[in-house]
């Protein structure tokens, strides 16, 4: 079986080339051709020795993910659905802005965490993506957008691991993919412009801080354990105190001096003044050292199976003001791509569920979710 070269970071590719009797500088050349120029045909790689190109043709390939569909929003957001085999498909979303281009990437086919407000969680979980399948989303999007815009300049300046899946539950594939994105011979992203979003897998947060510390976002969504247990089931394993301690440890190594807490605003569930006061006490405890953080309030994007509703704009604004008045930097996420189901929490793809999530979620829909003070 031939090797997919998208699976390798530069060190891995150098080791592979060494097995072929080649020096490291050949791996650098090959890496640049693949990631900077978007080449998948070894015959195009003109500065590689013909003998190496022939070797590669017999033992390696560059495997793009088949594109099932592409949708473009009225606001310019682009969503791609990629086929990852065995009846599974994952989604990636490009969000253009005046000063940046952000790509939201998936790390798993489905998700096993099962957050109540997330469409992906309702799809269940099939499998982890490989490093190559993670990188292939960036590889395709970057070079497809360059071709569309008629430019050789970099289009994607920021990558967020906020698509389908919990990245830190796919750690062994995640880290080589991050290293490829950061490598100056690859995509050359700054550690500050590469963000991993987690629902709070505490041991892997500690490992990432040592192995490949990039910007960190944490899906918080509740100010106390009782409510977070309902919204983010992983909280039952790693409760808030453990999670916040992990955030503090992570900041010792992080490229940014704050953690971004993501907070999906759910009408009547987690959006009341008391919840804001509890959040303030959580991250700014009286008499204790708090977590350096900012909050990103996310308007909920409804989907039929959730049984939940979006907080009204006035409630979101009042909630944000309470946090801001307490000295916490707070933003409200602008909804992008909701007309093509590309907004936060809407990515679902097509998942061959191996966790019976649909059955569990159907049972949960009969339970009235109530805020817990």
UniProtKB/Swiss-Prot annotation:
<keyword id="KW-0479">Metal-binding</keyword>
<dbReference type="GO" id="GO:0070040">
    <property type="term" value="F:rRNA (adenine(2503)-C2-)-methyltransferase activity"/>
</dbReference>
<dbReference type="Pfam" id="PF04055">
    <property type="entry name" value="Radical_SAM"/>
</dbReference>
<feature type="binding site">
    <location>
        <position position="118"/>
    </location>
    <ligand>
        <name>[4Fe-4S] cluster</name>
    </ligand>
</feature>
<keyword id="KW-0698">rRNA processing</keyword>
<feature type="active site" description="Proton acceptor">
    <location>
        <position position="91"/>
    </location>
</feature>
<dbReference type="GO" id="GO:0030488">
    <property type="term" value="P:tRNA methylation"/>
</dbReference>
<feature type="binding site">
    <location>
        <position position="301"/>
    </location>
    <ligand>
        <name>S-adenosyl-L-methionine</name>
    </ligand>
</feature>
<keyword id="KW-1015">Disulfide bond</keyword>
<keyword id="KW-0819">tRNA processing</keyword>
<feature type="disulfide bond" description="(transient)">
    <location>
        <begin position="104"/>
        <end position="344"/>
    </location>
</feature>
<dbReference type="GO" id="GO:0019843">
    <property type="term" value="F:rRNA binding"/>
</dbReference>
<dbReference type="InterPro" id="IPR004383">
    <property type="entry name" value="rRNA_lsu_MTrfase_RlmN/Cfr"/>
</dbReference>
<dbReference type="GO" id="GO:0002935">
    <property type="term" value="F:tRNA (adenine(37)-C2)-methyltransferase activity"/>
</dbReference>
<keyword id="KW-0963">Cytoplasm</keyword>
<feature type="active site" description="S-methylcysteine intermediate">
    <location>
        <position position="344"/>
    </location>
</feature>
<feature type="binding site">
    <location>
        <position position="111"/>
    </location>
    <ligand>
        <name>[4Fe-4S] cluster</name>
    </ligand>
</feature>
<dbReference type="InterPro" id="IPR013785">
    <property type="entry name" value="Aldolase_TIM"/>
</dbReference>
<keyword id="KW-0411">Iron-sulfur</keyword>
<keyword id="KW-0489">Methyltransferase</keyword>
<keyword id="KW-0949">S-adenosyl-L-methionine</keyword>
<dbReference type="GO" id="GO:0046872">
    <property type="term" value="F:metal ion binding"/>
</dbReference>
<dbReference type="GO" id="GO:0000049">
    <property type="term" value="F:tRNA binding"/>
</dbReference>
<comment type="similarity">
    <text>Belongs to the radical SAM superfamily. RlmN family.</text>
</comment>
<dbReference type="InterPro" id="IPR048641">
    <property type="entry name" value="RlmN_N"/>
</dbReference>
<dbReference type="GO" id="GO:0005737">
    <property type="term" value="C:cytoplasm"/>
</dbReference>
<dbReference type="InterPro" id="IPR027492">
    <property type="entry name" value="RNA_MTrfase_RlmN"/>
</dbReference>
<dbReference type="InterPro" id="IPR040072">
    <property type="entry name" value="Methyltransferase_A"/>
</dbReference>
<feature type="binding site">
    <location>
        <position position="115"/>
    </location>
    <ligand>
        <name>[4Fe-4S] cluster</name>
    </ligand>
</feature>
<keyword id="KW-0808">Transferase</keyword>
<dbReference type="GO" id="GO:0051539">
    <property type="term" value="F:4 iron, 4 sulfur cluster binding"/>
</dbReference>
<feature type="binding site">
    <location>
        <begin position="219"/>
        <end position="221"/>
    </location>
    <ligand>
        <name>S-adenosyl-L-methionine</name>
    </ligand>
</feature>
<dbReference type="Pfam" id="PF21016">
    <property type="entry name" value="RlmN_N"/>
</dbReference>
<feature type="binding site">
    <location>
        <position position="197"/>
    </location>
    <ligand>
        <name>S-adenosyl-L-methionine</name>
    </ligand>
</feature>
<dbReference type="GO" id="GO:0070475">
    <property type="term" value="P:rRNA base methylation"/>
</dbReference>
<protein>
    <recommendedName>
        <fullName>Dual-specificity RNA methyltransferase RlmN</fullName>
        <ecNumber>2.1.1.192</ecNumber>
    </recommendedName>
</protein>
<feature type="binding site">
    <location>
        <begin position="165"/>
        <end position="166"/>
    </location>
    <ligand>
        <name>S-adenosyl-L-methionine</name>
    </ligand>
</feature>
<comment type="function">
    <text>Specifically methylates position 2 of adenine 2503 in 23S rRNA and position 2 of adenine 37 in tRNAs. m2A2503 modification seems to play a crucial role in the proofreading step occurring at the peptidyl transferase center and thus would serve to optimize ribosomal fidelity.</text>
</comment>
<feature type="domain" description="Radical SAM core">
    <location>
        <begin position="97"/>
        <end position="339"/>
    </location>
</feature>
<keyword id="KW-0004">4Fe-4S</keyword>
<keyword id="KW-0408">Iron</keyword>
<dbReference type="InterPro" id="IPR007197">
    <property type="entry name" value="rSAM"/>
</dbReference>
